[in-house]
């Protein structure tokens, strides 16, 4: 199966209710290449493997091919990968993007809270993105959503022996058929109103025994808050 790291697709999901994920952003460099999450008016969290030195952040989007009047396009002023990010095993796959000017918060653009604690296995979460849906009927230009449970460390480690660090968690369905995939990378996993995950990697898309792997945001709270306070 393909090693899906470059970008990641919602498979087996549904079109999100428009603007129901107002923290969701699209990272654009002439085209949509990754997702991200607005965490306050100045900062976006994404995946380190989505790194580009300059990026346009598109907020308030639902259909990324159509101008709907709700959008804000703001360029980055700095892009900061986690200092311990490893492209070899995709460890610490998290980064911060500072906006060149504050986002205007409104119905369409709202931050998501950073986690107050790590969500336990079994917690239901929503992952969203504009990736490839692998479906002829779903419109990938419209934001896709999927509800997935956080899996236990043992289920995660059994799926990917020796590859799961304490900076990762698995979520989804071991039987396959529903997953995040190419084009969703860097995007949000939101559980009970908190950003618990960033779409990171996996084998293939929605394949049995290969759930999605996500950066574990709760262990990065100190780095996120101190970095945002510094810059």
UniProtKB/Swiss-Prot annotation:
Active site per UniProt: 49, 93, 185
Protein name: Trypsin-2
Catalytic activity from the UniProt record: Preferential cleavage: Arg-|-Xaa, Lys-|-Xaa
GO cellular component terms listed in the entry, alphabetical order: extracellular space
Gene3D superfamilies: Trypsin-like serine proteases (2.40.10.10)
EC number: 3.4.21.4
Cofactor field: Ca(2+)
Cofactor note: Binds 1 Ca(2+) ion per subunit.
Pfam families: Trypsin (PF00089)
Tagged with keyword Oxidoreductase: no
Signal peptide bounds: 1-4
Disulfide bond sites: 16-145, 34-50, 118-218, 125-191, 156-170, 181-205
Localization in the cell: Secreted, Extracellular space
GO terms for MF: metal ion binding; serine-type endopeptidase activity
Binding site for Ca(2+): 61, 63, 66, 71
SMART domains for the chain: Tryp_SPc
Species the sequence originates in: Salmo salar
Keywords, in A-Z order: Calcium, Digestion, Disulfide bond, Hydrolase, Metal-binding, Protease, Secreted, Serine protease, Signal, Zymogen
Residue numbers marked as site, Required for specificity: 179
Domain of life: Eukaryota
Residue ranges constituting the Peptidase S1 domain according to the UniProt record: 10-229
GO process terms (BP): digestion; proteolysis
InterPro entries xrefs: Peptidase_S1_PA, Peptidase_S1_PA_chymotrypsin, Peptidase_S1A, Serine_Proteases_S1, Trypsin_dom, TRYPSIN_HIS, TRYPSIN_SER
Main location: secreted
Pro-peptide positions on chain: 5-9
Family (UniProt): Belongs to the peptidase S1 family.
